[in-house]
Amino acid sequence: MVQRLLPGAHICRRSFNSSAIIKSSALTLKEALENVIPKKRDAVKKLKACYGSTFVGPITISSVLGGMRGNQSMFWQGTSLDPEHGIKFQGLTIEECQNRLPNTGIDGDNFLPESMLWLLMTGGVPTFQQAASFRKELAIRGRKLPHYTEKVLSSLPKDMHPMTQLAIGLASMNKGSLFATNYQKGLIGKMEFWKDTLEDSLNLIASLPLLTGRIYSNITNEGHPLGQYSEEVDWCTNICSLLGMTNGTNSSNTCNLTSQQSLDFINLMRLYTGIHVDHEGGNVSAHTTHLVGSALSDPYLSYSSGIMGLAGPLHGLAAQEVVRFLIEMNSNISSIAREQEIKDYLWKILNSNRVIPGYGHAVLRKPDPRFTAMLEFAQKRPIEFENDKNVLLMQKLAEIAPKVLLEHGKSKNPFPNVDSASGILFYHYGIRELLFFTVIFGCSRAMGPLTQLVWDRILGLPIERPKSLNLEGLEALTKASNVNKL
């Protein structure tokens, strides 16, 4: 059963370096981290000392020229991808996270992404009180953007790509980085780097609702606010309110959502951001954040660079492509009830050497549990989606497309991935600016790579510096290989 936050948690706060620090009888996130750090440091020290020469795996020329796909060459603690069970967060599956991580206390609410962040950071599930206090801490940290960031965002062209706006906004916040300031002044030693990195990371994550809302108002409302920030609600409720997508007093409710639709949209945001926080370390946004951070760049610069990677069409634009595909397909078939028409359309796509967007996965060999979670969100609300032919087509394709892809014979994984459902659900509730989907993705993904950045500092990991090979170097390896075969 999902844990629920206990009401009336005793919370007091004080300001420190523009951050709000929350004290309660339970351990804070920082205190919980301090409890697990010695054991982790000892484990890494022992691993390097006793087994440092152990081979991890072979690297082939194909992998070097093929994007390093499959090379096991990064340390990443928060998540691991299982071909059978999907992504695991500190060893917990999505289903286990849904059952064990605390939510708001309201029946039917999804777990809070704040609880997931705690899990990623500490490796443990937060208690009711810890989750309540941490939710409040982040809400206080995020209550105001730096004035210079506000000024920068106000000056940007309103039609600038929203991901460019997000990267610029995050990079501008480097001016207030505790880590960068104290490192430059020589006030912190290597073993203490993690503390300011944690402060910066939490401040960055807490700022994302206001950053996101400001960017959305830029591209949809000439920069005029669509909602108000509140310290009394959770991270995702603030995101939704600032997008103008709730029907409370803190939001303009531009899509005229009912009370139930507003609650559902908030829970969709919690679900989406909760399950997109991390996906191992090899994807472009995570690896870029880690790479830039390994040079001791602060979290703002590091994650801003990760956002630039996420903006690339091969990484963060799949959900948009699925939405366009569903809309186009619906305009070319007479009814989703006609399965043969759907099959014929899919075969037409495949026979023209195109792919069916939203299907397949580089590692998974079963349906993506993240897709299953999004699909169940829709299935639990049949009345809400009964007249949305795009959502209905998404559900129908999940039954038909895998069979077609199996018959086609070229797909190792014919099942739907999370992008097959996520974008069209946002589209249903009123987010029609497709390029903005990736900004929401970027809000969620901050949690995983920044958690790893904190742990990179805790463990004192060095700058990343792999050796490169030119064409002649690769050819020389083939000659040596041929000699060894003789």
Curated annotation (Swiss-Prot):
<protein>
    <recommendedName>
        <fullName>Citrate synthase 3, mitochondrial</fullName>
        <ecNumber>2.3.3.1</ecNumber>
    </recommendedName>
</protein>
<dbReference type="Pfam" id="PF00285">
    <property type="entry name" value="Citrate_synt"/>
</dbReference>
<dbReference type="GO" id="GO:0005759">
    <property type="term" value="C:mitochondrial matrix"/>
</dbReference>
<comment type="function">
    <text>Dual specificity mitochondrial citrate and methylcitrate synthase with similar catalytic efficiency with both acetyl-CoA and propionyl-CoA.</text>
</comment>
<dbReference type="GO" id="GO:0019629">
    <property type="term" value="P:propionate catabolic process, 2-methylcitrate cycle"/>
</dbReference>
<feature type="active site">
    <location>
        <position position="419"/>
    </location>
</feature>
<dbReference type="GO" id="GO:0050440">
    <property type="term" value="F:2-methylcitrate synthase activity"/>
</dbReference>
<dbReference type="GO" id="GO:0004108">
    <property type="term" value="F:citrate (Si)-synthase activity"/>
</dbReference>
<dbReference type="InterPro" id="IPR016143">
    <property type="entry name" value="Citrate_synth-like_sm_a-sub"/>
</dbReference>
<keyword id="KW-0496">Mitochondrion</keyword>
<feature type="active site">
    <location>
        <position position="315"/>
    </location>
</feature>
<dbReference type="GO" id="GO:0006099">
    <property type="term" value="P:tricarboxylic acid cycle"/>
</dbReference>
<dbReference type="InterPro" id="IPR019810">
    <property type="entry name" value="Citrate_synthase_AS"/>
</dbReference>
<dbReference type="GO" id="GO:0005975">
    <property type="term" value="P:carbohydrate metabolic process"/>
</dbReference>
<dbReference type="InterPro" id="IPR016142">
    <property type="entry name" value="Citrate_synth-like_lrg_a-sub"/>
</dbReference>
<keyword id="KW-0808">Transferase</keyword>
<dbReference type="GO" id="GO:0005739">
    <property type="term" value="C:mitochondrion"/>
</dbReference>
<comment type="pathway">
    <text>Carbohydrate metabolism; tricarboxylic acid cycle; isocitrate from oxaloacetate: step 1/2.</text>
</comment>
<keyword id="KW-0809">Transit peptide</keyword>
<dbReference type="InterPro" id="IPR036969">
    <property type="entry name" value="Citrate_synthase_sf"/>
</dbReference>
<comment type="similarity">
    <text>Belongs to the citrate synthase family.</text>
</comment>
<feature type="transit peptide" description="Mitochondrion">
    <location>
        <begin position="1"/>
        <end position="23"/>
    </location>
</feature>
<feature type="active site">
    <location>
        <position position="361"/>
    </location>
</feature>
<keyword id="KW-0816">Tricarboxylic acid cycle</keyword>
<dbReference type="InterPro" id="IPR002020">
    <property type="entry name" value="Citrate_synthase"/>
</dbReference>
<feature type="short sequence motif" description="Microbody targeting signal">
    <location>
        <begin position="484"/>
        <end position="486"/>
    </location>
</feature>
